[in-house]
A protein has these predicted regions:
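ATP-dependent small-molecule kinase phosphotransfer cores
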Residues: 1-47, 74
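Short, flexible helix/strand-to-coil boundary loops that buttress conserved ligand/catalytic motifs
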Residues: 2, 14, 22, 50, ...
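A non-catalytic, amphipathic alpha-helix used as a structural packing/dimerization or gating element
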Residues: 9-16, 93, 97-104
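Short acidic active-site motifs
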Residues: 17-20, 41, 90, 97, ...
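Short glycine-rich anion-binding loops that position phosphate/pyrophosphate groups of nucleotides
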Residues: 33-37, 60-62, 114
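Short amphipathic alpha-helical segments
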Residues: 41-44, 66-69, 121-122
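A glycine- and Lys/Arg-enriched "phosphate-lid" helix/loop adjacent to the NTP-binding pocket
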Residues: 50-97
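NTP-dependent small-molecule kinase module
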Residues: 53, 82-83, 96-128
Length: 128
C-alpha cells in the first residue's frame, strides 16, 4: 500500500479503520504504529473515548534501533537505511518530532531493560 499509493493514502485508510473499530463497542487491545497518533487528530480522537486507554510505550532510540534493524526490510519507512546508526538517527529525529503527540497518551510506560512479562504485568495493572 505504501509503495503503490504513498503514506498519505495509508494514513487516510488507517484513520478510516480506526473510526470503524470504535463504531461497535467491544473490548479489545490495539497496538498502533508510531505514526498513527501523529496524523489528523488521531490521538485526540482516541483520548476522547472514555473506554479507550492510550499508553505510550516509551523506548530509547538506541533500543528501538536495535529491535527494528533486524526487521527493517519489512517496514517501508526504514527499509532504505543501510546501518544501525542511520536507523538510530532516523528514530531519534522522528521521536523528537512525534513526542508531543506521544505525550498526550493517558499513561506512559518506560520499556527499556524490561522483560516482556514485566511489561505485560504493568499494562495489566493499568487495565485492572
Amino acid at each position: 500500500m505504501f509503495d503503490d499509493n504513498g503514506e498519505l493514502f495509508f494514513r487516510k485508510k488507517e484513520r478510516f479503520y480506526l473510526e470503524q473499530i470504535f463504531m461497535k463497542p467491544h473490548p479489545l487491545i490495539i497496538s498502533l504504529g508510531g505514526g498513527t497518533p501523529c496524523y489528523f487528530d488521531n490521538i485526540d480522537f482516541l483520548n476522547l473515548n472514555d473506554q479507550v486507554l492510550t499508553i505510550f510505550l516509551k523506548t530509547s532510540p538506541k533500543e528501538l534501533a536495535k529491535r527494528l534493524y533486524k526487521k527493517k526490510d519489512n517496514r517501508p519507512m526504514i527499509s532504505h537505511l543501510k546501518s544501525e546508526q542511520q536507523l538510530h538517527d532516523y528514530i531519534a529525529k522522528h521521536l523528537y518530532e512525534r513526542l508531543p503527540y506521544y505525550l498526550k497518551a493517558k499513561k506512559t510506560i518506560i520499556t527499556d531493560k524490561k522483560t516482556i512479562k514485566s511489561l505485560v504485568d504493568e499494562i495489566n495493572l493499568l487495565l485492572a
